[in-house]
Amino acid sequence: MENNTNMFSGVKVIELANFIAAPAAGRFFADGGAEVIKIESPAGDPLRYTAPSEGRPLSQEENTTYDLENANKKAIVLNLKSEKGKKILHEMLAEADILLTNWRTKALVKQGLDYETLKEKYPKLVFAQITGYGEKGPDKDLPGFDYTAFFARGGVSGTLYEKGTVPPNVVPGLGDHQAGMFLAAGMAGALYKAKTTGQGDKVTVSLMHSAMYGLGIMIQAAQYKDHGLVYPINRNETPNPFIVSYKSKDDYFVQVCMPPYDVFYDRFMTALGREDLVGDERYNKIENLKDGRAKEVYSIIEQQMVTKTKDEWDNIFRDADIPFAIAQTWEDLLEDEQAWANDYLYKMKYPTGNERALVRLPVFFKEAGLPEYNQSPQIAENTVEVLKEMGYTEQEIEELEKDKDIMVRKEK
């Protein structure tokens, strides 16, 4: 039954996209009650087959990665190289509110699916596109993944690691999900405009820009070369040793975060068991942490932190109201009481008989309640259903399948 409290009830999204970033935006709309129809080639979205690189068994019946990006959607297969396949797509666009894509612009132009062409045919349509590097400039047509466009080109991998070592190990989706949520926000705004004015719009987000926005504070600070540090840095070179992680006795890292150093100084020294340093004018003002004194404070904290376990520091810092968190592993998160209490995770029962934890999208709406978490569709699972809803007869569908204009999923 349709939940009319869902903000996107009655909205139709055509998703011409693969991998993660754009589908993540589509998932946001699907969770919000929109009908999101994902169009794939006969080979399917490559994300269906990435399990080995993630340390999972390859199974289409239990595909946690694909479910994260494509739950609650419908999936059809169209041959967009055929005239009939293109015709079906345009019939869908005529009734759609949003076209969501991660195709590169030159490919869209080649297929007559670029914004300038479509806005003449469908003036109310919102055109949403994820790119690697933006719409302009010498690299606008380069292929873009979050490993390359977000982490590397966007300034993450070149700065956020210990000086003298190597860039951090990156994992799939971290940059894509940020860009996808940015795009979802833009899509919602453009949809509101289209619904109130009758005029669609083009919404674009790039992976490179998403990373730059996330790092914006430090990118801007890098202009002041005579005042700041040039990253990458060593851990003990931080200008504020109260915003660093420290190793505990049992080899966990404990992250503290006290940007107003002066305010927290006495409290933190007391919590650390260094009451002798409370009020010490050498260290109690951040403006005094020059000429090596920041490193001295770092060393003091480091020496104290290894004297107790993470659980001991957990109790001490909670009692002292120190902003901190234990650096958790993914395995830790799967057992995290706070995550389960807030429905950040969902237990999916798969046809394989296994029950797996899946991560929910990080936006909740009180009145709508938690969205259903329906397993992502198999390749071409909804081709017949969607075409019948469009008015195609069984005979016409059979002919389209015979001519390879579409693909229909066969029941096993």
From Swiss-Prot:
Entry keyword set: Transferase
pH and activity: Optimum pH is between 7 and 8.
Underlying gene: fldA
Source organism, top-level taxon: Bacteria
GO biological process, one term: L-phenylalanine metabolic process
Protein name as annotated: Cinnamoyl-CoA:phenyllactate CoA-transferase
Coiled-coil residues: none
Pathway named in the protein's UniProt entry: Amino-acid degradation; L-phenylalanine degradation
Disulfide bond annotation, renumbered to this chain: none
Entry's Gene Ontology molecular function annotations: cinnamoyl-CoA:phenyllactate CoA-transferase activity
Job of this protein: Component of the phenyllactate dehydratase complex FldABC that is involved in the fermentation of L-phenylalanine via a Stickland reaction. This complex catalyzes the reversible syn-dehydration of (R)-phenyllactate to (E)-cinnamate in two steps, a CoA-transfer from cinnamoyl-CoA to phenyllactate, catalyzed by FldA, followed by the dehydration of phenyllactyl-CoA to cinnamoyl-CoA, catalyzed by FldB and FldC. In vitro, FldA can use 3-phenylpropanoate as a better CoA-acceptor than phenyllactate.
InterPro entries the UniProt entry points to: CoA-transferase_III, CoA-Trfase_fam_III, CoA-Trfase_III_dom3_sf, CoA-Trfase_III_dom_1_sf
Pfam families: CoA_transf_3
Signal peptide: none
Family per record: Belongs to the CoA-transferase III family.
Reactions the enzyme catalyzes: (E)-cinnamoyl-CoA + (R)-3-phenyllactate = (R)-3-phenyllactoyl-CoA + (E)-cinnamate
Binding site for CoA: N102
